[in-house]
């Protein structure tokens, strides 16, 4: 896919992997990029301004992907302001940190939120954007996780791993449902150095990184720009690729 003239939407795009994707797309030549956020208004607006100053039209839109009405309103605003949508990156996600062995702590409320955001949220965005994407032979990239591929030891919770596995399967289903006009692919990143991860581990974060890195053949964890690069590669270099999941894990799944 050539990016000149294209418009992209990145959910959960204010920072971390999402923010890196926004910057990659802007540098690669899209004409417009929309940054979706739920709570990170300051970060999203600052990033939109950064992208505008780089010469690419940008806006930040608040929308909770758990709310179908808000998702539809977001897509309608994109249609009104940009006239098109070519690329959807379903990056928004949520987890709760619950030991895999602690089944009692994994409540129905936790299950419901994790599945609603990580799976149904991606579906809502794809459904709302489908007609715009079909109009210009567009592309969807879903952001899953290595937790949806490997053993429970990689999971923040059993519900999160299950949801990310479901997102991989949703990718296959959407690839069939939206063919031949829209390609749908997925990335499954391993441990990535993001504010989300550092915020969870706090003072122990550097120690956690060191311990985790020892288990990777590349002897380190990922940075957001590396995941964004893989996503960009699927968008620009995979015109005959659909329904696939690219594992971006520094070789972790080999060990």
Give names to the regions the model predicted.
Residues 2, 126, 220-248, 253:
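C-terminal substrate-recognition "lid" of short-chain dehydrogenase/reductases
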Residues 41-42, 62-74, 108, 225:
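The beta1-alpha1 cofactor-binding region of Rossmann-like NAD(H)/NADP(H)-dependent oxidoreductases
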Residues 154-156, 191-216:
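A glycine/serine/threonine-rich, flexible loop-to-helix segment
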Residues 99-103, 107-112, 208, 212:
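Substrate-binding pocket helix/loop in short-chain dehydrogenase/reductase
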Residues 94-95, 108, 139-166, 171-179, ...:
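Catalytic loop of short-chain dehydrogenase/reductase
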Residues 30-46:
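Conserved glycine-rich Rossmann-like NAD(P)H-binding loop of the short-chain dehydrogenase/reductase
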Residues 14-15:
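Conserved glycine-rich cofactor-binding loop
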